[in-house]
């Protein structure tokens, strides 16, 4: 038992540096948070088969981590895309990664679900910070609170993915990278990517936007958002979203003010009521399955130098962490049971522009999102640089 606990602690340390006192340590953490987030989403949404994942423990939470596998070309390709993301992150060019799901290999512009991972770069101090709508002005957190905040984000992803309706049986993936144009060289492309063509996308059904959470540091801020079909939200009721989120007007849910102030209720927030879901899991202990695997971040863990000790109390984080402290991965809830296909295509789907997110309903009932992304960097929309994968599978 002691040996198993030691191994789990070691695996957790592999993902999260003990301290965030330098920009390099912060970069390592952000890369690994991106890796864990993408891995959890693709696993829980049933994108790739079991063999494409390894296992790591984040304290008491067992997570699946995507890895290269000769029997799953799709996972190998996605790992290569992630390495391209790391290159752009390291150079401080990367602003947003969009991972999109679509169903027709010949029509990657019509998407069924997408996940946005946003990045900001700052340089305000030596300790990572975690903020929310109610904590934006609080002081920096200790390293222990930083770790709790990061794990909390992963737990939230798990809870959301476990309760969304299943994807279609046969889906494809594509990835888009967006940049801070004022600092990114016009000819820059990460390894494995090429210049993309921004055209706007069509969303199958009626889109719902969910703000999953963020983990800021003095050097980086990492945010996660999800867009899915309204029909898949049937299980996201009062037991998961608080009444406050459920009262959010539809007009606001469908308005993405993006980088202006993400937290001003333009998305459904993800402060899920996890207590109800934990009670359900306790009633069905036989459904919980722990699993195993590897990790796609290959950097050595940074040797951190001492950081100041900020013993700040954050009751909201503590409460949410305690509510989800027993969270397990339930196979009956997480896998959609779809037919696994190793075809992945690079499409022209795009994240919703904050000012241009006016929705137009087609006769077919699909929603046009115009155009993909014109963030707060520009007051006048113009074509923004973005990249898409060179190869499709």
Curated annotation (Swiss-Prot):
PROSITE patterns: HORMA. The modification Phosphoserine is found at residue 375. Phosphorylated at Ser-376 in a SPO11-dependent manner. A motif (Nuclear localization signal) lies at residues 382-385. GO terms for biological process: blastocyst development; meiotic cell cycle; meiotic DNA double-strand break formation; meiotic recombination checkpoint signaling; meiotic sister chromatid cohesion; oogenesis; regulation of homologous chromosome segregation; spermatogenesis. Keywords: Chromosome, Differentiation, Meiosis, Nucleus, Oogenesis, Phosphoprotein, Spermatogenesis. The keyword Phosphoprotein applies. It comes from the Eukaryota. Residues 352-361 have a biased composition (Basic and acidic residues). Residues 24-226 form the HORMA domain. It is found in: Nucleus; Chromosome. Signal peptide: none annotated. Residues 322-393 are annotated as: Disordered. Pfam families: HORMA (PF02301). One of its GO terms (cellular component) is nucleus. The keyword Zinc does not apply. Interacts with HORMAD2. Interacts with IHO1. Plays a key role in meiotic progression. Regulates 3 different functions during meiosis: ensures that sufficient numbers of processed DNA double-strand breaks (DSBs) are available for successful homology search by increasing the steady-state numbers of single-stranded DSB ends. Promotes synaptonemal-complex formation independently of its role in homology search. This is HORMA domain-containing protein 1. It comes from Bos taurus.
């Amino acid at each position: 038992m002691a040996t198993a606990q030691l191994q789990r602690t070691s695996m957790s340390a592999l993902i999260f540096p003990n301290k965030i006192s330098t920009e390099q340590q912060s970069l390592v953490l952000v890369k690994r948070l991106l890796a864990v987030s993408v891995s959890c989403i693709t696993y829980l949404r049933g994108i790739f088969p079991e063999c494409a994942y390894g296992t790591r423990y984040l304290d008491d939470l067992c997570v699946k981590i995507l890895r290269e596998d000769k029997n799953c070309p799709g996972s190998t390709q996605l790992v290569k895309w992630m390495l391209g993301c790391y290159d752009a992150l390291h150079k401080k060019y990367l602003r947003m990664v969009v991972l999109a799901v679509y169903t027709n290999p010949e029509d990657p512009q019509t998407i069924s679900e997408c996940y946005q991972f946003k990045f900001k770069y700052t340089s305000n101090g030596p300790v990572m910070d975690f903020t929310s709508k109610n904590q934006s002005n609080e002081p920096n957190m200790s390293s222990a609170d930083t770790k709790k905040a990061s794990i909390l984000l992963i737990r939230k992803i798990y809870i959301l993915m476990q309760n969304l309706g299943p994807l279609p049986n046969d889906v494809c993936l594509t990835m888009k990278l967006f940049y801070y144009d004022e600092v990114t060289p016009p000819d820059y492309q990460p390894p494995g990517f090429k210049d993309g063509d921004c055209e706007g996308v069509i969303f199958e059904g009626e889109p719902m936007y969910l703000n999953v959470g963020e983990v800021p540091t003095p050097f980086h801020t990492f945010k996660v958002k999800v867009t899915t079909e309204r029909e898949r939200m049937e299980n996201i009721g009062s037991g998961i979203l608080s009444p406050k989120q459920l009262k959010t007007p539809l007009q606001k849910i469908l308005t993405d003010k993006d980088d202006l102030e993400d937290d001003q209720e333009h998305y459904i927030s993800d402060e899920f009521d996890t207590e109800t879901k934990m009670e359900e899991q306790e009633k069905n202990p036989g459904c919980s399955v722990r699993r195993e695997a590897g990790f796609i971040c290959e950097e050595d863990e940074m040797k951190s130098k001492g950081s100041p000790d900020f013993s700040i109390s954050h009751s909201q984080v503590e409460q949410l962490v305690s509510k989800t402290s027993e969270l397990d991965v339930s196979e009956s809830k997480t896998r959609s049971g779809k037919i696994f296909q190793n075809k992945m295509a690079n499409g022209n789907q795009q994240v919703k522009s904050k000012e241009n997110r006016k929705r137009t309903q087609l006769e077919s009932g699909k929603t046009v999102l115009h155009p993909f992304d014109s963030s707060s960097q520009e007051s006048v929309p113009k074509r923004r640089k973005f990249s898409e994968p060179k190869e499709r599978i």
